[in-house]
Amino acid sequence: MSEDLSMKCGLEIHVQVDTNSKLFCQCPTNYKDVEPNTNICPVCIGHPGAKPMPPNKKAIDMAIMVAKMLGCEMVIDKDIYFQRKHYNYPDLPSGYQKTSVPIGEHGTFLGVGITEVHLEEDPGQYKPDLGTVDYNRSGTPLIEIVTDPDMKSPEEAREFLRQLLRLFRYIGNLRGEGTMRADTNISIKYNGIQGNRVEVKNVNSIRGVYKVLKYELIRQKNVLRRGGEIKLETRAFMESQMITKGMRSKETADDYRYIPDPDLQPIVLSNDWVEKVEAQMPETPMNKEKRFVEQYGIKEDDAKVLVSDLELADVFEKVVAELGNDKDGISLAVTWIRNELKRVLVYNKIEFFETNLKPEHMVELINSIKDKTISQKIGKTIIEQMVEHKGEKTPKELISEMGLTVIEDTSELEKACEEAIKNSEKAIEDYKSGNQRALNSVVGQVMKLTRGRAEPGTVVEILKKKIDG
């Protein structure tokens, strides 16, 4: 019997703004670098009578920028006030969280509707297993992005988050996946039976969101298949087991007892304010990808790979400019940045910015290959060493240290070719019988004998002269 199964998913994504001070006080936000409960003040820890400062302007600017880049309509010339969202949990000493009404609404990103974007304060960090709370994080500015329930599969949600995090990297001043948290809301329809919405709180990685949705899809389907009912509830993600566990029945807005915060004046966004922020907005990844294809004439797949890493995209443009911005320069930059450098980054599981490589390093390497100081094979070795040495050594220094310059002494090359011919009787026979590709294995032998220091074109010429007589 065939199954009729569909799902709807919406996300509430929380991303920290990288400010020096917290949202409502002057305490620093570097909570990971200090001892527990040191970056705190009466405002952070909710002392009665402690009055918050006006909200951090940089945090507001970043919320405006995120909302604009997600295509939201801005809330202009209206009071944007902060509310007190009441709930009891050890990480929230005041008993309420300060959270704004929407700054932007009705946007869209990758075909997914954006319900709203607003600002709020991060709570502290509670460790139930130890019974400890660290309030250093309390009050750090958070931007919350609420989506419509438009995602139809775990894969779609995963791709949405990947692209959203890429956008955050382009925007800058936002902390990435390490601090991002998402609440996932999922409901399914199974053989005509509609289940209630389930929320899974505080999932802190893209992989986690994907696993939660896969698990909930199967769990909810099995409940409905057995004739059960999906409860309207909030669940927790048990990351070590990759499962979810019931926490409590789902809250409504009334449960949070929202009231305007009497200690904070409303924000009023003007057109001038929004336009000033817009003027500082970076090029989006999607626009950069399109421009790379049009401006440099490269393939869409190559543009996608380059643009996936902002620093990699920047170094590509700088290298192309140094190489002359012509067809050959672009082709070499694609080969050595998109293909070879990216290969090494993926193998080492690092991002470009972690390598400390500079554009001039890549230009020096490519020029060494262009002028045949080194072979392409050696170029691959050098790029691996450049990454391993974290940019501390230039390509020329590495080439010199490792003795990897191309062999220019013809007699040395001829000697290597003669030895390769002697050890490749079958390949020589096949070549003489008309199989041109058989020569490749002989060339490979020469490259091995010379540790990749031979120029392949020169090797082929010498081999043909010696074999063809």
Swiss-Prot record:
Enzyme class, UniProt record, top EC level: ligase
UniProt-listed Enzyme Commission number(s): 6.3.5.-
Reactions this protein catalyses: L-glutamyl-tRNA(Gln) + L-glutamine + ATP + H2O = L-glutaminyl-tRNA(Gln) + L-glutamate + ADP + phosphate + H(+); L-aspartyl-tRNA(Asn) + L-glutamine + ATP + H2O = L-asparaginyl-tRNA(Asn) + L-glutamate + ADP + phosphate + 2 H(+)
SMART domains: GatB_Yqey
Keywords linked to the UniProt accession: ATP-binding, Ligase, Nucleotide-binding, Protein biosynthesis
Gene3D superfamilies listed in its UniProt record: 1.10.10.410, GatB domain, N-terminal subdomain
Coiled-coil annotated residue ranges, if any: none
Molecular function, one GO term: asparaginyl-tRNA synthase (glutamine-hydrolyzing) activity
Family membership: Belongs to the GatB/GatE family. GatB subfamily.
Highest taxon in the source lineage: Archaea
HAMAP family xref list: GatB (MF_00121)
Pfam families reported for this sequence: GatB_N, GatB_Yqey
Protein's GO biological process: glutaminyl-tRNAGln biosynthesis via transamidation; translation
InterPro entries in alphabetical order: Asn/Gln-tRNA_amidoTrfase_suB/E, Asn/Gln-tRNA_Trfase_suB/E_cat, Asn/Gln_amidotransferase, Asn/Gln_tRNA_amidoTrase-B-like, GatB, GatB_C_1, GatB_Yqey_C_2, Gln-tRNA_amidoTrfase_suB_CS
Quaternary assembly: Heterotrimer of A, B and C subunits.
Protein name as catalogued: Aspartyl/glutamyl-tRNA(Asn/Gln) amidotransferase subunit B
Function noted in UniProt: Allows the formation of correctly charged Asn-tRNA(Asn) or Gln-tRNA(Gln) through the transamidation of misacylated Asp-tRNA(Asn) or Glu-tRNA(Gln) in organisms which lack either or both of asparaginyl-tRNA or glutaminyl-tRNA synthetases. The reaction takes place in the presence of glutamine and ATP through an activated phospho-Asp-tRNA(Asn) or phospho-Glu-tRNA(Gln).
PANTHER family in the record: GLUTAMYL-TRNA GLN AMIDOTRANSFERASE SUBUNIT B MITOCHONDRIAL AND PROKARYOTIC PET112-RELATED (PTHR11659), GLUTAMYL-TRNA(GLN) AMIDOTRANSFERASE SUBUNIT B, MITOCHONDRIAL (PTHR11659:SF0)
Keyword ATP-binding in record: yes
Organism: Methanococcus maripaludis (strain C7 / ATCC BAA-1331)
